[in-house]
Amino acid sequence: PIAKTDVVIYTDGACSGNPGPGGWAAILMAMGVEKEISGFEPDTTNNRMELTAALEALKELKRPCNVTLYSDSAYLVSAFNENWIQNWQKRNWKNAAGMPVSNRALWEEQKQHKMTWRKVRGHADNPYNNRCDKMAVNEIKENVP
């Protein structure tokens, strides 16, 4: 079997109002190559943009990889590192309060990769996180009159 490629991904999401217009961005790095992607949604939430950034980045990968994903979103990182998803599945996609889990379809899309989720401080000294933040905010600026 072919060895899985090691990929590092940085992501960020931004929202002007919550809900409101939002942007997401990601930087993917593998085998010495960097790729930047970003996008816009006219009516969304900050959590949805954080999650969309991660999943759009994962969609760029053409085969299963060893992924280390860095995000400043406690919501995103905790969902994976604290077994929220497994608990939601056991409760038929209901959260601890018995309400349907938001963004279920997005959560279910990340299964094929070996994932490591890492929390970084937002708006701090990480140049990749700061670049993603700028890209996500620019998506809003470019798409909202």
Predicted regions and their residues:
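A short, polar/acidic, helix/strand-boundary loop motif
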Residues: 32-49
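A short acidic-Thr-Gly-centered motif at the start of a beta-strand
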Residues: 1-4
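RNase H catalytic domain
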Residues: 7-8, 14-21, 55-135, 140
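Short amphipathic alpha-helical face segments that pack within enzyme cores
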Residues: 48, 52-56
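Structural detector for hydrophobic anchor residues on beta-strands
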Residues: 9-11, 24, 37, 51
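Acidic, metal-ligating active-site segments
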Residues: 21-30
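Acidic two-metal-ion nuclease catalytic site recognized across multiple nuclease folds
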Residues: 141-145
